[in-house]
Curated annotation (Swiss-Prot):
The keyword NAD does not apply. Phosphorylated on tyrosine residues. It is found in: Late endosome membrane; Lysosome membrane; Early endosome; Cytoplasmic vesicle, Clathrin-coated vesicle. One of its GO terms (cellular component) is lysosomal membrane. PANTHER family: VESICLE PROTEIN SORTING-ASSOCIATED. Transmembrane segments: none annotated. GO terms for biological process: intracellular protein transport; lysosome localization; melanosome localization; membrane fusion; platelet alpha granule organization; protein transport; vesicle-mediated transport. Its main location: membrane. Disulfide bonds: none annotated. This is Vacuolar protein sorting-associated protein 33B. The modification N-acetylalanine is found at A2.
């Protein structure tokens, strides 16, 4: 049922070292403020911190009370205050207000600000403007890599997507380059590097500069990971906009997985309490179904329940000695498995109820039609109906964006009509959101006569005119075009299937979207790995508007073992989805690779839309 790893699959590196490093550094920073202290933690850092150092560890290092950073006066009576925050202007103003309030009251305390993952000059400037810079000591907690699972690392920076891909803010690129530098220091150099996208290229170049500055740290080291692939989220928006149908993706879409764990409510736990559950490879039930298409999951869980019952029933014919062994060795494991099984059955039932209510089948049918380019008028009507019924502002936006990207922009009549209906249905406050979506290239309007061929000719003009200095005009008129249909054809993203697609025994990565579509990001990775570079993919790169932004760097490394050359680190800049993770795990099983994922944050279609929205839920 689950994807068993091939017997010859390479072993994954041990990423628990990253947790230990982060914990030790935090303890060191806390001990620089000797004695009892109160710790103020920003909400966004609470879940990551919990995975690294729990409350008892903090208490061992003289943290007395914990507070959440929120916009209200602090009630702390401690003589020492420590703030663990993201480098944000609003946090600086909050800290400054506390320090200034103490000054007004004639109270003297010690203040320490720990920025994670790094401090920015702008933050120090705000503290200076507020007149408190001399009263606080500032430090950095370079915690930028959180292992969520044996093969998944997250920077837990969901704001990376909006900051870079909408605002053009490059501040997190240094954080990413530092994270890659740390990985190459701990796990040896990466002999083969590939990448595509403007952000990927900038991050790669900065990372290489860091490597050169500290030359010698990785020299002579045996590489543990043979390949690294950096990919910008805007290279493939389509995959992130599609509804997920693998189990882990559906759990994320339905319940929101946060920092590797999920809150299951009473409808799942069959009690009056919610339960926080860690979802990773240690959960044996979850690990067997996480990458499966949802249609297979119920059958598997039913079979698992029967097997479990059979194991319980074995005890009936046991003598006292056998019963003693059963209780001491097996019973605890069976009870744990039973608890997890009940939870996942409850989660499946809850997902089924919600999806039946939403008419999920009709939604998936519309998405598939958009991906294939059929019945576009019918799909547009479906979206209009969705808006008129006020189903969900986020869902309606998502479908409009999917229509726009797959059709290379909406024809002006449809763009104006859908936008007007949306604003009338959900409110004029969403107007700025449309501006953001347009700016990011997610929801655009075709210029008159902007057919696919016209767009393609502009792209080729962009490539040929760059020497003549005309690149800026060509790029600005074109940067946000998607060319999805042409790319889909070139890379065979829509499989042609005779008869039914077998979701029980899938033959390709398309199973993560019910056999209708191979994720573009995953297909690019597959093709580049096969070719050991971008040779033969020039046309695809051109259609992706990345002619200057696809790179390969291969160094001959005799120390690289055949095992390390089958380990591939994929870095998603701007977030990746659980569907992409499942698809690449499948590819790894088929080809004998093991993929490791590093993402700025795990994302899905709703998070993508929320990042662009100016209306906060």
């Amino acid at each position: 049922m689950a994807f068993p790893h091939r017997p010859d699959a390479p072993e994954l590196p041990d990423f628990s070292m990253l947790k230990r490093l982060a914990r030790d550094q935090l303890i060191y920073l806390l001990e620089q403020l000797p004695g009892k202290k109160d710790l103020f933690i920003e909400a966004d850092l609470m879940s990551p911190l919990d995975r690294i150092a729990n409350v008892s560890i903090l208490k061992q290092h003289e943290v007395d009370k914990l507070y959440k950073v929120e916009n209200k006066p602090a009630l702390s009576s401690s003589e020492q205050l420590c703030f663990l925050v993201r480098p944000r202007i609003k946090n600086m103003r909050y800290i400054a207000s506390l320090v200034n309030a103490d000054k007004m009251a004639g109270r003297t305390r010690k203040y320490k600000v720990i920025f994670s993952p790094q401090k920015f000059y702008a933050c120090e400037m705000v503290l200076e403007e507020e007149g408190v810079y001399g009263d606080v000591s500032c430090d950095e907690w370079a915690f930028s890599l959180l292992p969520l699972d044996v093969d998944l690392l997250s920077m837990e920076l969901p704001e990376f997507f909006r900051d870079y891909f909408l605002e053009g803010d490059q501040r997190w690129i240094n954080t990413l380059a530092q994270a890659l530098h740390l990985l190459s220091t701990l796990y040896g150099p990466f002999p083969n590097c590939y990448g595509i996208g403007r952000c990927a290229k900038m991050s790669y170049e900065l990372w290489k500069r860091l490597e050169e500055e500290e030359d010698g740290e990785t020299k002579g080291r045996r590489p543990e990971i043979g390949h690294i692939f950096l990919l910008d989220r805007d290279v493939d928006f389509v995959t992130a906009l599609c509804s997920q149908v693998v189990y882990e993706g559906l759990v994320d879409d339905t319940f929101r997985i946060k920092c590797g764990s999920v809150d299951f409510g009473p409808e799942v736990t069959s009690s009056d309490k919610s339960l926080k559950v860690l979802l990773n490879a240690e959960d044996k039930v979850f690990n067997e179904i996480r990458n499966e298409h949802f249609s297979n999951v119920f059958g598997f869980l039913s079979q698992k329940a029967r097997n479990l019952q059979a194991q319980y029933d074995r005890r009936r014919g046991m003598d006292i000695k056998q019963m003693k062994n059963f209780v001491s060795q097996e019973l605890k494991g069976l009870k744990q498995e039973h608890r997890l099984l009940s939870l996942h059955i409850g989660a499946c039932e809850s997902i089924m109820k919600k999806k039946t209510k939403q008419d999920f089948q009709e939604l998936i049918k519309t998405e598939h039609a958009l991906l294939e380019g059929f019945n576009i008028r019918e799909s547009t009507n479906y979206i209009e109906e969705h808006i008129d019924r006020q189903v969900s502002p986020i869902e309606s936006l998502r479908l409009m964006c999917l229509l726009s990207i797959t059709e290379n922009g909406l024809i002006p009549k449809d763009y104006r009509s859908l936008k007007t209906q949306y604003l009338q249905s959900y409110g004029p406050e969403h107007l700025l959101t449309f501006f953001n979506l347009r700016r990011a290239g997610l929801l655009t309007e075709q210029a008159p006569g902007d057919t696919l061929t016209a767009v393609e000719s502009k792209v080729s003009k962009l490539v040929t005119d760059k020497a003549a200095g005309k690149i800026t005009d060509a790029f600005s008129s074109l940067a946000k075009r998607s060319n999805f249909r042409a790319i889909s054809k070139k890379l065979n993203l829509i499989p042609r299937v005779d008869g039914e697609y077998d979701l029980k025994v899938p033959r390709d990565m398309a199973y993560v979207f019910s056999g209708a579509y191979v994720p573009l990001s995953c297909r690019i990775i597959e093709q580049v790995l096969e070719r050991r570079g971008w040779q033969g993919l020039d046309e695809v790169v051109r259609l992706l508007n990345c002619s200057e932004l696809a790179f390969t760097d291969m160094t001959k490394d005799d120390k690289a073992s055949s095992e390390s050359l089958r380990l591939i680190l994929v870095v998603f800049l701007g977030g990746c989805t659980f569907s992409e993770i499942s698809a690449l795990r499948f590819l790894g099983r088929e080809k004998g690779y093991r993929f490791i994922f590093l993402t700025t944050a795990v994302t899905n279609s709703a998070r993508l839309m929320e990042a662009m929205s100016e209306v906060k839920a």
